[in-house]
Amino acid sequence: MPRIDLEAIEQVNRTGYPPPFNEQVQGRWYRRLAPAAGLTDFGVSHVVLKPGAWSSQRHWHNGEDEFLVMLEGEAVLVEDAGRTILRAGECAAWPKGSTNGHHLCNESDEDCTFVVMSGGTNTGGGYSDIDLAFTAEGTFVHRDGTPYPKTERPA
């Protein structure tokens, strides 16, 4: 199995979220590992959350499973049922089609690092707490389907 050199993969903090929903993820830095490794059936990202940053808005995927492994530090997992601290070595999973909106918040004074994997068919999804959804085409829309203005989107 080929070793992946993280330092050789660009680390970015881009987001496609329309304002003001982009503000909470400004301290989220990620590397897209799947494209760099030639993987095409599922996504893998190495993510660093700076103190105070969110991994995303609280969301779910209609057609994609997600699996997360916390590598370093800790973050608060926020889901419909409440808040749970995830520490290094702990995992979380969300099956496709579950509308249990989730995200991580780094409420500590140190960076936290995790790897998240997703697989399935991108058929869109939604956001629990805000007037936002995403389509299979990768665009953001209001819950009523009205598009948001186009913003920067990660490659």
PLM regions with names:
Residues 80-96:
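Short acidic-glycine-tyrosine-enriched beta hairpin
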Residues 29-32, 45-61, 99:
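Conserved short histidine dyad/triad with adjacent acidic residue
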Residues 1-41, 125-155:
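A short, N-terminal "cap"/entry segment at the start of jelly-roll beta-barrel domains
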Residues 38, 96-123:
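Ligand-binding loop in jelly-roll beta-barrel domains
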Residues 46-50, 61-77, 117-119:
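Short, conserved beta-strand element in jelly-roll/cupin
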Residues 65, 72-74, 81, 99, ...:
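A generic structural motif
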